[in-house]
C-alpha cells in the first residue's frame, strides 16, 4: 500500500526496508500503474480482469461487470510508457514487512464501447429495427385492399346494371304521366257527351224526360285496363275526377228541375 493511506498504518518504530525482485538484474516480475479516464461502477471488483499487450505497446484491458449488467464486460484501450526512476512502497500489515519495488511502465487507457455491448447502442438498434418493420407493415396494409378490389370487368358490369335500373325507372315514370294525361282527357270528353245527351232529353218535346239512375261518369266512362303500377300512381287522381263528376251531375239536375217548375 502506498500514499497517505498507507502511511497512516506506520508507527514511530524503525522497520526494515527490503528491495523487491524488480531490482534484480534479471527481474522475475514487473510492476505497472494503470490510469483510467473513467471506471464505471458496474465493474465487479471481486473478479480478475485480463490485460493484453499488442504491437506498438498497445494495451487492452477487459474487466467483467456485475452479473446481469449490459454489456457483460467493460473494455479499455490505451498505451504504456516506461518509467525511469519511479518506485512503489508495498507494506504488508500482517507481517509488518516493507518492500520497495521499481515501476516498469505507466499504462493509460480509455473506456471503449464494444459493438453490440453498449446499452445505448442496443436501444438504438431496437429503434432501427422498429423503424425497419414499420414501412413493411404499412406497405402490407396499403397493398392488401388493392388485392381485394374488383376487376375492371366486374366494375363496368355494376355500372351498366345501375344505368339500366335508372333507365327503367324513368320509363315507368314517363308511362305513368302519359297514362294520367290520356285518362284525364277521356274522362272530360265522356262528361261533356253525357251532359249533351241529358240536355237533349230534357228539352225534346217528343221524348219523355228520363234520368239515368246510374252515375253519368260510371256509365259513360270507358273502361281501361291499366297495370298495377298505373293504378297505384293514379288512384288519388281518379278519386278527385269522380268527385268532380258527381258535383257537376247534381248541379245539372237542380237546374233542370228549376226550369220545369217555371
From Swiss-Prot:
The keyword Thylakoid does not apply. It comes from Mus musculus (Mouse). Component of the super elongation complex (SEC), at least composed of EAF1, EAF2, CDK9, MLLT3/AF9, AFF (AFF1 or AFF4), the P-TEFb complex and ELL (ELL, ELL2 or ELL3). Interacts with ELL and ELL2. Isoform 1 and isoform 2 interact with TCEA1. Residues 17-104 are annotated as: Necessary for interaction with ELL. GO terms for molecular function: transcription elongation factor activity. The modification Phosphoserine is found at residues 146, 151, 154. Belongs to the EAF family. Residues 248-262 are annotated as: Necessary for interaction with TCEA1 and transactivation activity. Residues 174-192 have a biased composition (Low complexity). It comes from the Eukaryota. This is ELL-associated factor 2. Residues 193-202 have a biased composition (Acidic residues). Its main location: nucleus. Residues 227-237 have a biased composition (Basic and acidic residues). GO terms for cellular component: nuclear speck; nucleoplasm; nucleus; super elongation complex; transcription elongation factor complex. Isoform 1 is expressed in ovary, uterus, mammary glands, brain, spleen, liver, lung, thymus, kidney, skeletal muscle, skin and testis. Isoform 2 is expressed in kidney. Residues 177-262 are annotated as: Necessary for transactivation activity. The gene is Eaf2. GO terms for biological process: epithelial cell proliferation involved in prostate gland development; intrinsic apoptotic signaling pathway; negative regulation of cell growth; negative regulation of epithelial cell proliferation involved in prostate gland development; positive regulation of DNA-templated transcription; positive regulation of transcription by RNA polymerase II; regulation of transcription elongation by RNA polymerase II; transcription elongation by RNA polymerase II. Residues 170-237 are annotated as: Disordered.
Amino acid at each position: 500500500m502506498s500514499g497517505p493511506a498507507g502511511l497512516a498504518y506506520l508507527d514511530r518504530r524503525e522497520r526494515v526496508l527490503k528491495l523487491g525482485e524488480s531490482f534484480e538484474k534479471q527481474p522475475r516480475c514487473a510492476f505497472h500503474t494503470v490510469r483510467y479516464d473513467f471506471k464505471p461502477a458496474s465493474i465487479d471488483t471481486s473478479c480478475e480482469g485480463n490485460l493484453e499487450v499488442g504491437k506498438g505497446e498497445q494495451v487492452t484491458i477487459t474487466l467483467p461487470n456485475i452479473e446481469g449488467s449490459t454489456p457483460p464486460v467493460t473494455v479499455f484501450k490505451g498505451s504504456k510508457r516506461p518509467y525511469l526512476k519511479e518506485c512503489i512502497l508495498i507494506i504488508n500489515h500482517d507481517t509488518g514487512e516493507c518492500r520497495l519495488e521499481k515501476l516498469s511502465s505507466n499504462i493509460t487507457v480509455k473506456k471503449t464501447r464494444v459493438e453490440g455491448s453498449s446499452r445505448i447502442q442496443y436501444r438504438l438498434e431496437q429503434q432501427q429495427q422498429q423503424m425497419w418493420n414499420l414501412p413493411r407493415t404499412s406497405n402490407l396494409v396499403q397493398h392488401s385492399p388493392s388485392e381485394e378490389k374488383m376487376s375492371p370487368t366486374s366494375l363496368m358490369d355494376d355500372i351498366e346494371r345501375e344505368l339500366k335500373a335508372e333507365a327503367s325507372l324513368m320509363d315507368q315514370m314517363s308511362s305513368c304521366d302519359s297514362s294520367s294525361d290520356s285518362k284525364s282527357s277521356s274522362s272530360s270528353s265522356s262528361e261533356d257527351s253525357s251532359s249533351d245527351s241529358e240536355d237533349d232529353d230534357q228539352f225534346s218535346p217528343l221524348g219523355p224526360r228520363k234520368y239515368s239512375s246510374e252515375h253519368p261518369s260510371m256509365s259513360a266512362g270507358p273502361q281501361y285496363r291499366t297495370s298495377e303500377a298505373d293504378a297505384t300512381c293514379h288512384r288519388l287522381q281518379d278519386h278527385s275526377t269522380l268527385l268532380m263528376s258527381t258535383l257537376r251531375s247534381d248541379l245539372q239536375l237542380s237546374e233542370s228541375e228549376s226550369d220545369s217548375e217555371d
